Amino acid sequence: MKIVAPAGNMERFYSAISATADEIYLGLKGFGARRNAENFTVEELKKAIDYAHLRGSRIFLTLNTIMTNREIELLYPTLKELYNYGLDAIIVQDLGYAEYLHKNFPSIEIHGSTQMTVANHYEINYLKELGFKRIVLPRELSFEEIKEIRENTDMELEIFVSGSLCISFSGNCYMSSFIGGRSGNRGMCAQPCRKEYKTSCGEKSYFLSPKDQLYGFDEIKKLQEIGVESIKVEGRMKDVSYVYETVSYFRSLINGIDKEENTHKLFNRGYSKGYFYNNDKAIMNRDYSYNMGEKIGEVLGKNIRLDEDIVSGDGVTFVSKDYKNLGGTYIGKINVVNVKEDRKIAYKNEKLILNFPEGTKYIFRKIGRA
């Protein structure tokens, strides 16, 4: 089983390679489903191809949006240059563009994006006839649905195992376009589903905001057993630490080591198993829609009782009882109740002396941003 990792820029690319990613997906500036990512110039992409190939990894270019005639014509000389340079695969959403690529660059691998919403083996086998090599299945499929597809096709399958979930099917959502004039199907989603809304009865909540997906040891083992070729880490908009820690986490799971030690410190909106087992309200997070990280303490009187160790230099966020973000700070000098000596660390179950905003109930620590 291979790990397909994201890279939003060169720094994150190096991080993915260091974490032993087998395949890296990345985008050109101005194209693909993550236009707001930093992305790559042609020269940077060629540099990445060289670096990856020397280390036994492969590079996939994301052109996974609806394409216009002008964009197809504009991209031709760039793709020809990258094709001749050794680009391994192109990830697409647009069927017409896939046909164009197959005719003009016959030896390039064509992968079907999750944006295509290919949810049955009949369509997958049809796409194979059209020259597709691999399909990235929708996040919205359960394990039983994935298993049925695997039993009825020999197409390479790629499964998302971490990252953001969409309130709609990816590639079929018009909410951002309707509300803010930014099409999620053209790489410019404004994520209005992450906003707080109010019902006609006055109740406020993040009604449309799903938790982030994170598969564990059992889920990866099940996917290995049915013969899924690749697992995919979401995150071209995520930072270096997120890419490195998440890829390392899945490498451990593939190697049979069950661990989750750093995942709750990374960017997340709370975790769920997504649609792997079922589709119910456990997928949703109505309390907050932003990165919280790892809960490490709770206000007890005038101090904070620690649920985890905390170290000088850690960044923390203060959160109210209804999970409103009240701001954050970096931990400087460590002051612990009934402890006089200077320390760089406070331990689990100790009471930390720390100024915090009025209304604070919890403190969270995070090491990843987006």
PLM region spans:
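Beta/alpha (TIM)-barrel catalytic core signal, keyed to glycine-rich beta->alpha loops juxtaposed to Asp/Glu
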Residues: 117
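Surface-exposed amphipathic alpha-helical tracts and adjacent flexible/coil segments at the periphery
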Residues: 1-19, 23-33, 49, 55-83, ...
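Glycine-rich, positively charged N-terminal anion/phosphate-binding segment
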Residues: 34-51
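Conserved nucleotide-cofactor-binding alpha/beta core module
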Residues: 121-122
